[in-house]
């Protein structure tokens, strides 16, 4: 994140999706405010935070939408996805059901996203927990099949949290069609080795 007061290069809309209880709000709050609440309440509808970060020397403003995972809020789905440039899909490595429902979330992204080349990041959360039931290999295989970035993280210990957002934003900036409508002459340099190829976060 950046405290630079200069005008941002662009403003990006980032969604955080996944089943209820997987730690979506905890990931967002750890990234934005560097706090962790083990008793974090379930999101009602949508939570919304604005922050900024520096990418390749440019300040990028982020509008982060933390969406509710409960079925009763799904009627609001189309408005959530409209105009988003990036989506973070979270599952809980201690919950097999949250992993098995990833197909549903990927279908929802494909159905409602208005940007065909939206950048997707799969996050395996709660890797600090001892009762893990979803392996790293399973997560990587799913991410590869759906052509998404992949990282393991813990909102509690902070592991992987900063990298999740950095890698996602770098990929978006490297895809000017997603955000560069008003700046036709501006292009960042070539992707770095840590950001190219594969589905793994290189942080």
From Swiss-Prot:
A molecular function GO annotation: GTPase activity
GO biological process entries: intracellular protein transport; lipid droplet organization
Reaction equations catalysed: GTP + H2O = GDP + phosphate + H(+)
Pfam families: Ras (PF00071)
Residues reported in the UniProt entry to bind GTP: 20, 23-26, 37-38, 43, 69, 126, 128, 155
CDD domains (alphabetical): Rab18
Coiled coil location: none
Disulphide-bridged cysteine pairs: none
Annotated lipid attachment (S-geranylgeranyl cysteine): 201, 203
Motif Effector region, chain ranges: 40-48
EC number(s) recorded for this UniProt protein: 3.6.5.2
InterPro entries referenced in this protein's UniProt entry, alphabetically: P-loop_NTPase (IPR027417), Rab (IPR050227), Sigma_54_int_dom_ATP-bd_1 (IPR025662), Small_GTP-bd (IPR005225), Small_GTPase (IPR001806)
Family annotation (PROSITE patterns): RAB (PS51419)
Phenotype of the disrupted gene, per the record: RNAi-mediated knockdown results in disrupted clearance of intracellular pathogen N.parisii from intestinal cells.
Cysteine methyl ester modified-residue sites: 203
PANTHER family to which the protein is assigned, alphabetical: RAS-RELATED PROTEIN RAB
Family: Belongs to the small GTPase superfamily. Rab family.
Name of the protein: Ras-related protein Rab-18
Organism ancestry: Eukaryota, Metazoa, Ecdysozoa, Nematoda, Chromadorea
